[in-house]
């Protein structure tokens, strides 16, 4: 069992802005792209997670859980858990989003909404993850037009 899986049993995730996979891969997630991070990272510590919503995905293959860091309520957390072994496939932490508290499945995508209007969008298990923040929206740079 990985360190991430062991810590998740106590609802703890790495204190790292971005997506951390159970195999050790790390990604930065942005509005229009995600990129692998190759340099050594200083993760800091671990965050305790208060789960605010959860939703089963794809007929019982996965469970997506979202919430906030108990230490600081403005930090949003999303975890994709395998229902085969109840271990995290990946964890996502954002100190720009506020807590994530709603999950919507639409058109094959998972949309996780935060209390500030931020949206984490992904296809499970990990396809094209994007983080849309309300103040950096492509619509805001386009005068609010769609």
Tell me what each language-model feature is.
Residues 2-22, 44-61, 65-66, 93-107, ...:
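Repeated scaffold domains used in trafficking and secretory/extracellular systems
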Residues 59, 74, 106, 115-116, ...:
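Short loop/turn segments that connect beta-strands within the blades of beta-propeller domains
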Residues 115-146:
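Alpha-helical oligomerization segments
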Residues 38-46, 86-94, 128-133:
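A short beta-strand motif characteristic of beta-propeller blades
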Residues 71-79, 118-121:
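Structural motif
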Residues 34-36, 47-50, 70:
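Sequence-structural signature of mature extracellular/luminal beta-sheet repeat domains
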Residues 65, 112-113:
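Conserved beta-strand element within WD40/beta-propeller blades
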């Amino acid at each position: 069992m990985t360190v991430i899986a062991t810590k998740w049993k106590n609802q703890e995730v790495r204190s790292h802005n971005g997506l951390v996979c159970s195999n050790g891969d790390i990604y930065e997630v942005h509005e229009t792209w995600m990129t692998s991070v190759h340099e050594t990272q200083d993760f800091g510590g671990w965050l305790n997670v208060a789960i605010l919503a959860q939703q089963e995905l794809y007929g019982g293959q996965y469970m997506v859980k979202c919430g906030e860091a108990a230490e600081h309520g403005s930090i949003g957390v999303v975890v994709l858990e395998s229902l085969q072994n109840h271990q995290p496939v990946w964890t996502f932490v954002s100190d720009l989003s506020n807590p994530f508290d709603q999950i919507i499945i639409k058109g094959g995508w998972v949309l996780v909404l935060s209390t500030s209007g931020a949206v984490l969008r992904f296809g499970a298990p990990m396809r094209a993850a994007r983080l849309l923040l309300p103040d950096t929206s492509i619509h805001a740079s386009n005068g609010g037009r769609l």
